[in-house]
């Protein structure tokens, strides 16, 4: 599955929705988990486009559409429920934000929060969609629609921001070794 390939945990299916979370049981850190989730969503979006094209060619006039919402933040993860029925899941306000981002996304679109954008901005081109208020959330949520992934330059080099971050990570690791 695409989600598992990128390190995601498939939490549950809710009607026609699928909930995937990153960071547990194994985490690469908040930044890398957010980036993995963005990569997963882009691969899922590509696969859906391929399926939609195939189904149209097979005569299905209106193949289904997919919306994705991604938020980054801390949640409670574990076994919840009663002794008779425990469920390994993720709960919390940040989960609610992700669900509401999904509901607000355009058909076949990916809507992300600023918290996710901050970690993955060098991977994607986005369109700012403004801040939205969500019932039960005590802050406005800045949103961005993912337009596409950032393409490497003709020589295959990564964007400059990615290079400098790699350098900073290496420099930090060297400092810790002293």
Put a short name on every predicted segment.
Residues 75, 104-177:
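Cytosolic regulatory/linker segments at or just downstream of nucleotide-handling modules
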Residues 14-20:
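Short, conserved phosphate-binding/catalytic loop or strand-edge motifs used
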Residues 1-8, 24-68, 72, 93-95, ...:
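Alpha-helical scaffold within the catalytic cores of cyclic-nucleotide enzymes
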Residues 18, 25, 71-76, 116-117:
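Short, internal active-site loops enriched in acidic
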Residues 10-12:
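A short pre-motif secondary-structure segment
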Residues 79-82:
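Cytochrome P450 core scaffold surrounding the K-helix E-X-X-R motif
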């Amino acid at each position: 599955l695409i989600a598992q390939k990128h390190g995601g945990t498939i939490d549950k299916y809710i009607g026609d929705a699928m909930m995937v979370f990153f960071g547990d049981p194994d985490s690469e850190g908040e930044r890398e988990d957010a980036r993995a989730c963005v990569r997963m969503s882009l691969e899922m979006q590509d696969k859906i486009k391929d399926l939609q094209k195939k189904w149209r060619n097979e005569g299905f006039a209106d193949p289904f559409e997919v919306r994705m919402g991604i938020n980054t933040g801390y949640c409670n993860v574990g076994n919840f429920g009663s002794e008779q029925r425990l469920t390994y899941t993720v709960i919390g306000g940040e989960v609610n934000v992700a669900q509401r981002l999904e509901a607000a996304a355009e058909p076949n679109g990916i809507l992300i929060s600023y918290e996710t954008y901050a970690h993955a901005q060098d991977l994607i081109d986005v369109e700012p969609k403004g801040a939205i208020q969500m019932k039960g959330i005590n802050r406005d949520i800045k949103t961005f629609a993912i337009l596409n992934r950032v393409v490497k330059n003709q020589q295959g080099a990564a964007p400059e921001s990615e290079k400098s971050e790699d350098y900073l990570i290496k420099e930090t690791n060297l400092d810790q070794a002293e």
